[in-house]
Amino acid sequence: MMKRVAVLQDISGLGRCSLAAALPVLSVMGVQCCPVPTAVYTNQTGFSRFAFLDCEPLLGDFTSLWQEHGVTLDGICTGFMASVEQLEAARAFIDAFRTHENLLLVDPVMGDDGTRYPCFDDEFCDAMRAFAARADVITPNVTEACILTGTPYEAFAGQAEAVQRETLRRMCGVLPPERIVITGWRRGNRVCNAAWDRSAFAIYESPAVGGSWSGTGDLFAAALCGGLVKGEPLEISVRRAMRFLEPALRDAARLGLPGVGGVPFEMHLKELL
């Protein structure tokens, strides 16, 4: 039977990110993606101006009506949350549909490049820390892993490879989830992802591409979720997600695409088959 995953995050009309990224990725992997939009944006927040509709009041209806319809899920995946209120509504949804058999993957979006996003304050980060602690799998970038663990970003940035590796291993060891992927930092001409799987630690590398584009974390998390829900080992799911993103990043660089538009992943969905 086809696996079914609920994805709780926003959807943007422009910018290949969030639900606009998760829907095609999970679908091509043979997983039914059931979108639960937390907000609707005209364009993702990296643009100079945007308008949005907060869907937080609707999340309670998703929860109650899906329960009424007898919905069961094989996985729940969460991404960008705009407020503590959205986190609380997502928590209620998860409480309603979480079982011992299904997978909860949390992408704890809070910042990047050593800086917390301006829209988030200490209260939100504390709430996200508690929210992510309940997950089976989390996919923070290095900045977010530092926020979750209270680690100074300087303990990682600019340090020697051995120091970075030990910092990553230590952060994974103090975080509650059994499986953790710390995503997408650069080391020389390589891009790296660190994976923690029930205390087993490994770093996977692929060639780096110049530039930075929005939505790559969303694409990675969706591909990872699809593999794990289908019962794949963490290593295989991480490697497939990296193999999928690499040519899309190369195309974005070759075409000179602006970072706010995301990467042209559509032609590379076949890498997920």
Predicted features along the sequence, with ranges:
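Short, small-residue alpha-helix embedded
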Residues: 147, 211-234, 238
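Short pre-catalytic strand/loop immediately N-terminal to key active-site residues, enriched for Gly-Thr
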Residues: 13, 201-214
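Charged C-terminal helix
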Residues: 235-273
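Conserved N-terminal subdomain of the carbohydrate kinase-like
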Residues: 2-106, 110-118, 267-271
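A non-catalytic, amphipathic alpha-helix used as a structural packing/dimerization or gating element
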Residues: 58-61, 130, 170, 236-244
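Conserved phosphate/ATP/ADP-binding segment of small-molecule kinases
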Residues: 118-201, 235
